[in-house]
Each structure stands twice: as structure tokens, then as C-alpha cells.
């Protein structure tokens, strides 16, 4: 076993079970471990929704139990400028961004990585993400986590091989039940804490209520895509995403049959929300997509056609596809089979077996 005791690792302690067990596992591997709690959002009047105080207390309790120092840092300004404002801009444009991907890119593997290295003298950072790192020929690769249900590589595709080389992912080799078991055996404060859901800055509150504070409601018509028949009113296109079924306010429609209604398109210029019946309606299906803002983990641009698999959203089954470079940092992706609810603003992430190659932002879906 290599001597890790000279190596300092700063673990991003979120107050959750995964980062808690990560800190313990790194201790067991002999590293000098310290924790860092990041505050990325300034609560104003939302204390009942914001769990930051509880999370910090839980992180502190775990660090006390493990006998490690816990540092704190406030990245709220960086988060607002580099994550939240972009998130709002995308919603205003009628797209559906993924703030967790942005947060990993701008905060956890940029602001945190720089702070840990420069201010705390870290050799590595570590997080509780369910991914694995594999070094080949001097380059670090990003692999899916061993737990297929929890794999989080989709959210980390923007990382470069250099960033991965500076990062450790201890729970990526484990399955979630094993992680909980370790926490319970150690009697860590976070052992039974449920996984956080929802977007980090929104917490458990209703998404539409949160968005309404920053983006004014813009009501407009809901039309049936098949015959332009009025189906109701929406309160704002930003509250709806392609493939959405709930929250449309369309009940039983005369002569409408039993199939539920789905969002199939948004006309941003005219503020129209288009819906159709059935989850396999042709307007919901795509044969491919065009992606931009590409990030390849090895940082080598794609120069030739590539056969691989793609995910257009988290937890989706892998879709076999062919990727073709278009130049100007864009690619065309053609699926072997049509895919439902491919959503502009979301990320398309590419894989070869367990290796995450990288990805990009979906610019448009191809329906032919």
C-alpha cells in the first residue's frame, strides 16, 4: 500500500451520508483528511426550506466523531454569478437547464478545488459522488459508479481529466446500501438521513413557487398540437418541460379519449404551450439531436464519427447512437431508435461501456 499519510485530502462535507462515509473511507486508506462545508446559497426568508444550518450541524457532528477538522467557506456570490443567473437565463429562453451539472462545473470542481489547493494546501479533494476514477496512460478517466441506481457520472461530464486527477470518489466503488451500513455501524449522525432531493438552492419547496419569485408569470394559451384546439391556459412556459404530464390543468376532454396529455413543444416567440395525447405521440419523439458547449473528459475534440451510447437525462437507459462532429464545437447525434422527450437545455452525455466520454447541451432535437 502506498503511503498516503503525507497526502492531504479535503472532503466536501454536505451533511449527507455519502460524504460522511467518504471521509471515513479516506481515513481508513491512511490519508490526512479534513472536511469543508460549502455554503452556496444565502437564505433570506426561507429558513424553513433551507437546510443549510441542519446540514452544517450534521457535517460538524460527523467530523467530530471521526476526529477531523471541518472548514467552512461561502461560495454564494460565485454560485449566484456562475450558476443561478445562467439557470434563470435558460428558463427565460424556454429551455430546461440542469443546475446540478452547472454547480459541479463552477463550484464543486472549480471554486472548491481551487480553494482546497490554494488556501488549505490539499493534494486532492473528495466528494460523495457515485462515480469512479481510472487512470490510464497518465490520464484520468471518469467511470460510472458501481451502483447502477446511483451512478452520478451524468452530472460530472464537464470535468476534465486534470480535474478528475485531483479528485477522489471513495463511495463510487460501493453500492448505496453498503454506504448506509458503514454509517450505521459507525453510528454517524447522518446514517439514517434521507437523500436530498430537488435542486440544491430550492430544497424541498415547490419549484413553481420558487421560480415565480425571480421570473414573472407570463400566461398564455395551451393548444393541442394536432388541431390547434385551445386546451387551457399556462402561467408561463418556464414552468413546463417537454414530456411533462402533471400540472397542465387539462382534465377530461370531450371526445378526448383516455390517454393523458403531455407537453410536446413550446413556441417561445408566441408564448404557446403545445400538448398532445399519449407518451408516444410523434411530436414527442426525436430521432436525434444537435448538441453544443461540448466538454470531452480527455479534452480532445471529436474529429471523426463515433459509435457510443448517450443519455439525454439522468437515470435514462443508455441509447445506442452515432455522433458526428459538425465543426464549430457542435455535434449531431442520431439515435438507433426514437427517443421521447429530448429537451433543449438539458445535457446529452456519452459513454463507451463504463467510461463517461463527456457531453454537451442539447441545442435542438431532430424529429426527422
Curated annotation (Swiss-Prot):
Which coarse location class applies to the principal site listed for this UniProt protein? Answer: cytoplasm
Which SUPFAM superfamilies does this UniProt record tie to the protein?
Answer: Adenine nucleotide alpha hydrolases-like (SSF52402)
Name residues in a coiled coil: none
- Which InterPro entries did the record assign? MnmA-like (IPR004506), MnmA-like_C (IPR046885), MnmA-like_central (IPR046884), MnmA-like_central_sf (IPR023382), Rossmann-like_a/b/a_fold (IPR014729)
Q: Name one GO molecular function term.
A: tRNA binding
Q: Could you give a single Gene Ontology term from the biological process aspect?
A: tRNA wobble position uridine thiolation
Q: Mark the transmembrane ranges.
A: none
Indicate the residues that form the catalytic site.
Answer: 103 (nucleophile), 200 (cysteine persulfide intermediate)
Instruction: Please report any disulfide bonds recorded for this protein chain, giving both cysteine positions.
Output: 103-200
Sorted alphabetically, which keywords does the UniProt record give?
A: ATP-binding, Cytoplasm, Disulfide bond, Nucleotide-binding, RNA-binding, Transferase, tRNA processing, tRNA-binding
Query: What reaction gets catalysed by this protein?
Result: S-sulfanyl-L-cysteinyl-[protein] + uridine(34) in tRNA + AH2 + ATP = 2-thiouridine(34) in tRNA + L-cysteinyl-[protein] + A + AMP + diphosphate + H(+)
- NCBIfam families per the record? PRK00143.1, trmU
The record ties this protein, via HAMAP family, to: tRNA_thiouridyl_MnmA
The entry assigns this protein to a family as follows:
Belongs to the MnmA/TRMU family.
Q: What does this protein do?
A: Catalyzes the 2-thiolation of uridine at the wobble position (U34) of tRNA(Lys), tRNA(Glu) and tRNA(Gln), leading to the formation of s(2)U34, the first step of tRNA-mnm(5)s(2)U34 synthesis. Sulfur is provided by IscS, via a sulfur-relay system. Binds ATP and its substrate tRNAs.
- Please report the name of this protein according to its UniProt entry: tRNA-specific 2-thiouridylase MnmA
Q: Which organism is it from?
A: Pectobacterium carotovorum subsp. carotovorum (strain PC1)
State the gene name recorded for this protein.
mnmA
Amino acid at each position: 500500500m502506498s503511503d498516503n499519510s503525507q497526502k492531504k485530502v479535503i472532503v466536501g462535507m454536505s451533511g449527507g451520508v455519502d460524504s460522511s462515509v467518504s471521509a471515513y473511507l479516506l481515513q481508513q486508506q491512511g490519508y490526512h483528511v479534513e472536511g469543508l462545508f460549502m455554503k452556496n446559497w444565502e437564505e433570506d426568508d426561507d429558513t424553513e426550506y433551507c437546510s443549510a444550518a441542519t446540514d452544517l450541524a450534521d457535517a460538524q457532528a460527523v467530523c467530530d466523531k471521526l476526529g477531523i477538522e471541518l472548514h467552512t467557506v461561502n461560495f454564494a456570490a460565485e454560485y449566484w454569478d456562475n450558476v443561478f443567473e445562467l439557470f434563470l437565463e435558460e428558463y427565460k429562453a424556454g429551455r430546461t437547464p440542469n443546475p446540478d451539472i452547472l454547480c459541479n462545473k463552477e463550484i464543486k470542481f472549480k471554486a472548491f478545488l481551487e480553494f482546497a489547493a490554494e488556501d488549505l494546501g490539499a493534494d486532492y479533494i473528495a466528494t460523495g459522488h457515485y462515480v469512479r476514477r481510472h487512470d490510464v496512460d497518465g490520464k484520468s478517466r471518469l467511470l460510472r459508479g458501481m451502483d447502477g441506481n446511483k451512478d452520478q457520472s451524468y452530472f460530472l461530464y464537464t470535468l476534465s481529466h486534470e480535474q478528475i486527477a485531483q479528485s477522489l470518489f471513495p463511495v463510487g466503488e460501493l453500492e448505496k446500501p453498503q454506504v448506509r451500513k458503514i454509517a450505521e455501524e459507525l453510528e454517524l449522525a447522518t446514517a439514517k438521513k434521507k437523500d436530498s432531493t430537488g435542486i440544491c438552492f430550492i430544497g424541498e419547496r415547490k419549484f413553481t413557487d420558487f421560480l415565480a419569485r425571480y421570473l414573472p408569470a407570463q400566461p398564455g394559451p395551451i393548444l393541442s398540437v394536432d388541431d390547434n384546439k385551445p386546451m387551457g391556459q399556462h402561467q408561463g412556459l418556464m414552468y413546463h418541460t417537454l414530456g411533462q404530464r402533471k400540472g397542465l390543468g387539462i382534465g377530461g376532454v370531450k371526445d378526448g379519449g383516455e390517454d393523458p396529455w403531455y407537453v410536446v413543444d413550446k413556441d417561445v416567440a408566441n408564448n404557446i404551450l403545445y400538448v398532445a395525447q399519449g407518451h408516444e405521440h410523434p411530436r414527442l419523439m426525436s430521432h436525434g439531436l444537435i448538441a453544443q458547449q461540448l466538454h470531452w473528459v480527455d479534452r480532445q475534440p471529436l474529429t471523426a464519427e463515433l459509435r457510443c451510447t448517450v443519455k439525454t437525462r439522468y437515470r435514462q437507459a443508455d441509447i445506442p447512437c452515432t455522433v458526428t462532429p459538425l465543426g464549430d464545437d457542435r455535434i449531431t447525434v442520431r439515435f438507433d431508435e426514437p427517443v421521447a422527450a429530448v429537451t433543449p437545455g438539458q445535457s446529452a452525455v456519452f459513454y463507451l461501456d463504463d467510461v463517461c466520454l463527456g457531453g454537451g447541451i442539447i441545442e435542438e432535437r431532430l424529429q426527422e
